[in-house]
Amino acid sequence: MDLKTTIEMMQSDDYKERFKAEYHQTKIRYERLKKLNTQIEAAERAIFCPPNRAGTTMAMPNHDCPADLLRQQQSIMGEYLHILEVRAEIEGIVL
């Protein structure tokens, strides 16, 4: 699923469909942020490693925000996803 496929769900009159769309949108954004944070952490740690076989070092991904703030955002988004998952279980919503 990608963000475009959730547009119709967000416009539904059924709150369960909007709920699913919100969950999937948040999950997509969370996974993208997680990937960025993983790349940032790997680049930070690679500074202490010798160059790879090709003789190059890992480049730091472009980001304008401090890495610790991005990690905090990921953590809070993860908590929010967990809340949505618990609520879905309670309300019988299949994500």
Regions of interest found by a model, annotated:
Residues 1-95:
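Extended, charge-rich alpha-helical interface modules
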